[in-house]
Structure formats: C-alpha cells, structure tokens
C-alpha cells in the first residue's frame, strides 16, 4: 500500500507545483537527513478577500498514512486555533476529511485546502468542535468577528 500512497503523493506534489490557487502553499516537510517526507505536508491557507479572515495565511499540517488515498489525511491548524469546526487540538472537522462521510479517494490536496478555506468563513454550526467559537458565532457575532480579525493578524502572509 505504501507504494500506492507515495506514488499518489508524488503525483499530487507535481500537480500542485504546476497549478495551485493563488496565495496557498503546500509542500512536503523535510526529514532531518534532508530528504522529503511525502507523508507530512506544511500548508498555508489564505483567508478569502472581503471576509474577516482576509489578511491571514493560516498554517496547516496535513498528515497522510500509507492508506492514502483510501483514507483521508488528518489536517491540523495550530493548537487552540479559533474556529467552530476546529478542535482545541487543531484538528479540522470537515465532511470531506471524514471517511464515513464525504471522503473519496479522488479528493485531492487542492480540493481539501480549498474546502478548508471555504469552511473558515462558512462554519458548520451542526458540527461544532469547540465550545467558545460556536457559542460566539451563534449568539454574539460581533465578538466572534472581532476574534477572527485578531487571529488574522497572528498569521500574516509569509514574506
């Protein structure tokens, strides 16, 4: 199975380098010996323009297993990332990342990152992962928006 997953991840890397959405980045991490680790990717997701997320590029780690693409990657923002659909551990709660829901082996890294970007400004109140963000999102949108804007300043675009 490792052969299938590493071949698919190599292909994904090639496709990403050839064509990826503006402002995003996604690259395999580097092992201590300098070789690429195709199973752990460092990614950045820009906030959409004209949203409270604009101005930030949000760091995300994508971790793949040797069962990829049969099983989805695990996607994590930094610990305590403020969003209704992100667990305190940073793990993203999104249906396309759920094997029992909408995951399909045809889903690409690009599709996942675009889906997470969309989730940032369009949280799913039916699938909350954190108490405070969902509470503010539903009951005090002004305070929620203030926290989101403050978070965008914590994650400026890379220079």
UniProtKB/Swiss-Prot annotation:
CDD domains recorded: UBCc_UBE2I
Q: Where is the UBC core domain?
A: 4-157
Q: What are the recorded GO MF terms, alphabetically? A: ATP binding; SUMO conjugating enzyme activity
* Subcellular localization(s) per the UniProt record: Nucleus
Q: Which UniProt keywords apply?
A: ATP-binding, Nucleotide-binding, Nucleus, Transferase, Ubl conjugation pathway
Record keywords: ATP-binding included? yes
User: Taking the first listed entry, what is the main subcellular location of this protein, grouped into a coarse class?
Assistant: nucleus
Question: What GO terms fall under cellular component here?
Answer: nucleus
SUPFAM superfamilies in the record? UBC-like
Pfam families to which the protein is assigned, alphabetical: UQ_con
> A single GO BP annotation from the record?
protein sumoylation
Q: Which domain of life is it from?
A: Eukaryota
Listed InterPro entries:
Ub_conjugating_enzyme, UBQ-conjugat_E2_core, UBQ-conjugating_AS, UBQ-conjugating_enzyme/RWD
Q: Which PROSITE patterns match?
A: UBC_1, UBC_2
Family the UniProt entry places it in = Belongs to the ubiquitin-conjugating enzyme family.
Under which name does UniProt file this protein?
Sumo-conjugating enzyme ubc9
Report the source organism. Dictyostelium discoideum
